[in-house]
Swiss-Prot record:
The active site is at 8 (proton acceptor), 131 (proton donor). One of its GO terms (biological process) is L-histidine biosynthetic process. The gene is hisA. Pathway: Amino-acid biosynthesis; L-histidine biosynthesis; L-histidine from 5-phospho-alpha-D-ribose 1-diphosphate: step 4/9. GO terms for cellular component: cytoplasm. PANTHER family: 1-(5-PHOSPHORIBOSYL)-5-[(5-PHOSPHORIBOSYLAMINO)METHYLIDENEAMINO] IMIDAZOLE-4-CARBOXAMIDE ISOMERASE. Its main location: cytoplasm. It catalyses: 1-(5-phospho-beta-D-ribosyl)-5-[(5-phospho-beta-D-ribosylamino)methylideneamino]imidazole-4-carboxamide = 5-[(5-phospho-1-deoxy-D-ribulos-1-ylimino)methylamino]-1-(5-phospho-beta-D-ribosyl)imidazole-4-carboxamide. SUPFAM superfamilies: Ribulose-phoshate binding barrel. It is found in: Cytoplasm. Belongs to the HisA/HisF family. This is 1-(5-phosphoribosyl)-5-[(5-phosphoribosylamino)methylideneamino] imidazole-4-carboxamide isomerase. It comes from the Bacteria.
């Protein structure tokens, strides 16, 4: 079970939102590169970046901050990025700059064929982000709720080579209320693509439940406010997850 620190970028700063509300942003650092280095020092094995301004604008808006993070990271760990990725040219540029995996969100909902094109052009470098409120997918920085159900939409991407589905429960994001385990597991059971949980991670009980769900296809979880507010220590939490993974694997063997 991989715990992936999130670095959400707004106006060049590292922030955390509450339920995706841009007016409820807490600034945790004005130096995203330093924040990336901090998480690496804590044992992060991957970083999850979101260009929040880009998600609303439909194009990248925090490229300077993204480049500062990539400079700080170097070749140490992979970096995934979502928010405002709507064309193949942007994907190519990001991969050339050092991003390991791009996350297609709004564009995947509005034009699923774009995901297939991206997977064909950049195999092994594409994930899909599905963000939902009450089971319905949201787009445009979570500002619009669609009629699409998460599982129905996710099934469209099964045969195209998508590396993972990042599933976010908007209602829990930034609220420290616990991961929506039931919805995450149901999604993982319904599709053949690995699932990364997002939204609400708060304590070791969440980690325990997620580790139990690994055999269902849940491969990781995005860690946000819990590690910024020190409710969870990243290094200790990852160690705990590693121990649980071994424990549950032994039980199933």
């Amino acid at each position: 079970m991989l715990l992936i620190p999130a670095i959400d970028l707004k106006d060049g700063h590292c922030v955390r939102l509450e339920q995706g509300d841009m007016d409820k942003a807490t600034v945790f650092s004005e130096d995203p590169g330093a924040m990336a280095a901090h998480w690496i020092s804590k044992g992060a094995r991957c970083l999850h970046l979101v260009d929040l301004n880009g998600a609303f604008a439909g194009k990248l808006k925090n490229e300077s901050a993204i480049k500062s993070i990539l400079k700080a990271v170097g070749d140490e760990i992979p970096v995934q990025l979502g928010g405002g990725i709507r064309d193949l040219e942007t994907i190519e540029r990001l991969l050339d700059d050092g991003i390991s995996t791009v996350i297609i969100g709004t564009a995947a909902v509005k034009n699923p064929g774009f995901v297939q094109d991206a997977c064909t052009a950049f195999p092994g470098h594409v994930m899909v982000g599905l963000d939902a409120r009450d089971g319905k997918v949201a787009t445009d920085g979570w500002s619009k709720i669609t009629c699409h159900k998460v599982i129905d939409l996710a099934k469209k991407f099964e045969d195209w080579g998508v590396e993972a589905i990042i599933y976010t429960d908007i209602g829990r994001d930034g609220m420290l209320k616990g991961v929506n385990i039931d919805a995450t597991v149901k999604l993982a059971q319904a599709i053949r693509i690995p699932v990364i949980a997002s939204g609400g991670l708060s304590n070791n009980q969440d980690i325990d439940a997620l580790c139990k769900a690994e055999e269902e296809g849940v491969m990781g979880v995005i860690a946000g406010r819990s590690i910024y507010a020190s409710d969870l220590d990243l290094a200790a939490a990852q160690k705990y997850a590693d121990e649980l993974t071994l424990k549950y694997k032994k039980k199933t063997n």
